[in-house]
A protein has these predicted regions:
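Glycine/aspartate-rich loop-and-adjacent alpha/beta segment that forms the canonical ThDP
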Residues: 134-200
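Conserved thiamine diphosphate
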Residues: 57-61, 107-140, 191-199
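Generic beta-sheet signal
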Residues: 60-64, 91, 150-156
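Cofactor-binding active-site loop characterized by glycine-rich and histidine/acidic residues
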Residues: 10, 14-85
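Single conserved hydrophobic/aromatic residue that forms the stacking wall/gate
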Residues: 1-13
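A short alpha/beta connector and helix-capping loop motif
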Residues: 73-98, 153-155
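Short acidic, glycine/serine/threonine-rich loops at helix termini
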Residues: 75-77, 103-107, 164-169
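Acidic, glycine-rich active-site loops and adjacent beta-strand->loop/helix elements
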Residues: 17-19, 66-73, 97-101, 132-134, ...
Length: 200
């Protein structure tokens, strides 16, 4: 069982019709303050929440997760410009950088690289990490909490489908649910990977 302080998630929750399905739904998942779907809208809402936090002198932080294909949307950069202008040091943007989107490799569709340099140009504090390494993820979140006067972008280099042999780095699994047999194999492989992580 995987869990966080906000949302306990069991492997069963990863089923296609469950609380862990597809896009996060704020009606069903504690800690999710906005349901997402249309690309680029999440960061705009996050910037608004971070501005509200500043106006209220609140000490909360706002986290938003973007796909690397999603940052092809102009709305992402409009929101980023405002976040930097407002010095939103209570905002952390995480970019899942796996180079795959529904149409194929993002480098072949409409490359946003170098992602880190683009966020730096918008005056973000940028942290590059291996997004499949939990220690690096933890260190990045801790570093982000120390940043003052500018938003943070964590550029997490990941492998899409990591831990499931037949899904790793395969664009065909973008938005596709496994059948019963594939699901069983995937869960077995993830259980083994999880056990190995716990032994570290």
């Amino acid at each position: 069982t995987a869990s966080t302080d906000i949302y306990p998630l069991s492997l069963h929750d990863a089923l296609p019709i469950s609380s862990g399905q597809g896009h996060p739904d704020m009606k069903h998942i504690p800690g999710v303050d906005m349901s997402s779907g249309s690309l680029g809208q999440g960061i705009s809402a996050a910037v608004g929440m971070a501005i509200a936090g500043k106006l209220d002198n609140a000490d909360y932080r706002v986290y938003t997760l973007l796909g690397d294909g999603e940052i092809q949307e102009g709305q992402v950069w409009e929101a980023s410009m405002l976040a930097a202008h407002r010095k939103l040091d209570n905002l952390v943007v995480i970019v899942d950088n796996n180079n795959l989107q529904i149409d194929g490799a993002i480098t072949e569709v409409n490359s946003p690289y170098p992602i880190d340099k683009k966020f730096e140009a918008f005056n973000f504090h940028v942290i590059n990490i291996d997004g499949n390494d939990f220690d690096q993820i933890d260190a990045a979140f801790k570093e982000a909490k120390t940043v003052k006067g500018q938003p943070t972008a964590i550029i997490a280099k990941t492998v899409k489908g990591k831990g499931v042999s037949f899904m790793e780095n395969q664009v065909g699994w973008h938005g596709k649910a496994p059948n019963d047999e594939e699901y069983k194999i995937a869960m077995e492989e993830l259980e083994k990977a999880g056990e190995a992580l716990c032994q570290k």
